[in-house]
Protein backbone atom coordinates (compact mmCIF):
# COMPACT_ATOMS: atom_id res chain seq x y z
CA UNK A 1 0.00 0.00 0.00
CA UNK A 2 2.99 2.35 0.24
CA UNK A 3 2.19 6.03 0.72
CA UNK A 4 -1.56 5.44 0.72
CA UNK A 5 -1.19 2.84 3.46
CA UNK A 6 0.98 5.20 5.48
CA UNK A 7 -1.65 7.93 5.32
CA UNK A 8 -4.57 5.57 5.91
CA UNK A 9 -3.13 3.66 8.87
CA UNK A 10 -1.36 6.67 10.37
CA UNK A 11 -4.43 8.91 10.24
CA UNK A 12 -6.76 6.20 11.54
CA UNK A 13 -4.44 5.24 14.41
CA UNK A 14 -2.41 8.39 15.18
CA UNK A 15 -1.50 7.35 18.72
CA UNK A 16 0.50 4.36 17.45
CA UNK A 17 3.15 6.45 15.71
CA UNK A 18 5.66 9.17 16.52
CA UNK A 19 5.65 10.42 12.91
CA UNK A 20 4.56 9.55 9.38
CA UNK A 21 6.73 9.23 6.26
CA UNK A 22 4.41 8.71 3.27
CA UNK A 23 5.93 8.37 -0.17
CA UNK A 24 3.70 8.91 -3.21
CA UNK A 25 0.42 8.53 -1.34
CA UNK A 26 -2.86 9.60 -2.87
CA UNK A 27 -5.16 12.04 -1.13
CA UNK A 28 -8.56 10.52 -1.81
CA UNK A 29 -9.73 7.59 -3.87
CA UNK A 30 -12.17 9.80 -5.79
CA UNK A 31 -9.29 11.92 -7.11
CA UNK A 32 -6.84 9.05 -7.61
CA UNK A 33 -9.32 6.80 -9.38
CA UNK A 34 -12.26 8.88 -10.63
CA UNK A 35 -15.41 6.90 -10.76
CA UNK A 36 -17.80 9.27 -12.52
CA UNK A 37 -17.69 7.48 -15.90
CA UNK A 38 -17.50 3.89 -14.65
CA UNK A 39 -20.41 1.78 -15.91
CA UNK A 40 -20.95 0.48 -12.37
CA UNK A 41 -21.77 4.05 -11.36
CA UNK A 42 -23.76 5.08 -14.41
CA UNK A 43 -26.15 2.12 -14.27
CA UNK A 44 -26.38 1.50 -10.52
CA UNK A 45 -29.47 2.20 -8.48
CA UNK A 46 -29.37 5.12 -6.01
CA UNK A 47 -29.36 2.66 -3.11
CA UNK A 48 -26.29 0.83 -4.46
CA UNK A 49 -24.53 4.14 -5.11
CA UNK A 50 -25.20 5.30 -1.57
CA UNK A 51 -23.77 2.08 -0.13
CA UNK A 52 -20.73 2.31 -2.35
CA UNK A 53 -20.12 5.93 -1.40
CA UNK A 54 -20.35 5.11 2.29
CA UNK A 55 -17.84 2.28 1.86
CA UNK A 56 -15.44 4.49 -0.10
CA UNK A 57 -15.58 7.38 2.38
CA UNK A 58 -13.03 5.63 4.57
CA UNK A 59 -10.56 5.98 1.67
CA UNK A 60 -10.67 9.78 1.86
CA UNK A 61 -7.40 10.58 3.63
CA UNK A 62 -8.17 14.30 3.55
CA UNK A 63 -11.22 13.74 5.77
CA UNK A 64 -8.91 12.34 8.47
CA UNK A 65 -6.09 14.88 8.09
CA UNK A 66 -7.04 16.55 11.38
CA UNK A 67 -5.69 13.42 13.09
CA UNK A 68 -2.13 14.43 12.09
CA UNK A 69 -2.15 17.33 14.56
CA UNK A 70 0.39 15.61 16.84
CA UNK A 71 2.23 13.65 14.12
CA UNK A 72 5.22 15.20 12.39
CA UNK A 73 5.15 14.24 8.71
CA UNK A 74 7.88 13.96 6.09
CA UNK A 75 6.39 13.59 2.61
CA UNK A 76 8.47 12.30 -0.31
CA UNK A 77 7.23 12.57 -3.88
CA UNK A 78 8.79 12.08 -7.29
CA UNK A 79 8.06 15.06 -9.54
CA UNK A 80 7.80 12.72 -12.56
CA UNK A 81 5.42 10.27 -10.87
CA UNK A 82 2.66 9.23 -13.27
CA UNK A 83 1.19 6.58 -10.94
CA UNK A 84 0.38 8.99 -8.11
CA UNK A 85 0.80 12.50 -9.54
CA UNK A 86 2.59 15.07 -7.35
CA UNK A 87 -0.60 17.12 -6.91
CA UNK A 88 -1.62 14.67 -4.16
CA UNK A 89 1.55 15.24 -2.10
CA UNK A 90 1.43 18.99 -2.73
CA UNK A 91 -2.16 19.08 -1.52
CA UNK A 92 -1.23 17.23 1.68
CA UNK A 93 1.66 19.63 2.25
CA UNK A 94 -0.52 22.70 1.73
CA UNK A 95 -3.33 21.46 3.98
CA UNK A 96 -0.91 20.48 6.76
CA UNK A 97 0.81 23.88 6.55
CA UNK A 98 -2.52 25.73 6.66
CA UNK A 99 -3.28 23.92 9.93
CA UNK A 100 0.20 24.72 11.29
CA UNK A 101 1.01 21.02 11.57
CA UNK A 102 4.63 19.89 11.35
CA UNK A 103 5.44 18.87 7.78
CA UNK A 104 8.62 18.46 5.74
CA UNK A 105 8.14 18.12 2.00
CA UNK A 106 10.63 16.50 -0.37
CA UNK A 107 9.79 16.58 -4.07
CA UNK A 108 12.54 14.90 -6.06
CA UNK A 109 12.69 16.50 -9.50
CA UNK A 110 14.25 13.64 -11.47
CA UNK A 111 12.28 10.78 -9.86
CA UNK A 112 9.12 8.94 -10.85
CA UNK A 113 7.00 6.66 -8.65
CA UNK A 114 9.88 4.31 -7.84
CA UNK A 115 13.63 4.34 -8.29
CA UNK A 116 16.22 1.64 -7.75
CA UNK A 117 19.30 3.74 -7.21
CA UNK A 118 21.43 2.18 -4.48
CA UNK A 119 22.03 4.06 -1.27
CA UNK A 120 25.38 5.71 -0.95
CA UNK A 121 26.11 3.56 2.12
CA UNK A 122 25.27 -0.13 2.36
CA UNK A 123 22.60 -1.93 0.39
CA UNK A 124 18.99 -1.24 -0.36
CA UNK A 125 17.23 1.29 -2.53
CA UNK A 126 17.33 5.01 -1.81
CA UNK A 127 13.58 5.06 -2.46
CA UNK A 128 13.09 3.16 0.82
CA UNK A 129 16.31 3.46 2.78
CA UNK A 130 16.71 7.21 2.55
CA UNK A 131 19.07 8.69 5.10
CA UNK A 132 17.13 11.97 5.46
CA UNK A 133 13.86 10.14 6.18
CA UNK A 134 15.46 7.71 8.62
CA UNK A 135 17.16 10.53 10.55
CA UNK A 136 13.88 12.47 10.66
CA UNK A 137 12.05 9.43 12.06
CA UNK A 138 14.75 8.70 14.65
CA UNK A 139 14.34 12.19 16.11
CA UNK A 140 10.62 11.77 16.77
CA UNK A 141 9.04 10.56 20.01
CA UNK A 142 5.47 9.71 20.84
CA UNK A 143 4.21 12.24 23.32
CA UNK A 144 0.91 12.44 25.13
CA UNK A 145 -0.83 15.60 23.91
CA UNK A 146 -2.47 17.97 26.40
CA UNK A 147 -5.57 17.98 24.24
CA UNK A 148 -6.59 16.47 20.96
CA UNK A 149 -9.40 16.11 18.47
CA UNK A 150 -9.95 12.90 16.58
CA UNK A 151 -11.91 12.49 13.39
CA UNK A 152 -13.40 9.02 12.99
CA UNK A 153 -15.59 7.34 10.45
CA UNK A 154 -16.40 4.09 12.19
CA UNK A 155 -15.98 3.63 15.94
CA UNK A 156 -15.84 -0.13 15.52
CA UNK A 157 -12.54 0.25 13.64
CA UNK A 158 -10.63 2.78 15.70
CA UNK A 159 -12.09 3.73 19.05
CA UNK A 160 -8.98 3.40 21.24
CA UNK A 161 -5.91 5.57 21.47
CA UNK A 162 -2.98 5.19 23.86
CA UNK A 163 -3.41 8.76 25.06
Show the residue positions of the predicted features.
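Hydrophobic/aromatic beta-strand patches that form the interior of the parallel beta-sheet core
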Residues: 21, 74-76, 106
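Short, solvent-exposed turn/loop segments enriched in Gly/Ser/Thr/Pro and often Arg
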Residues: 1-3, 23-26, 109
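Conserved alpha/beta-hydrolase "acid-adjacent" motif
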Residues: 82-88
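Active-site neighborhood of glycoside hydrolase catalytic domains
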Residues: 58, 70, 88-102
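Short beta-strand/loop motif that positions the catalytic acidic residue
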Residues: 68, 74-77, 81
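Short glycine-enriched nucleophile-adjacent loop
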Residues: 3-14
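Mobile cap/lid helix-loop segments that gate and shape the active-site cleft of serine hydrolases
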Residues: 12-66, 70-71
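Alpha/beta-hydrolase-fold serine-hydrolase catalytic core, especially in secreted/extracellular enzymes
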Residues: 94, 98-163
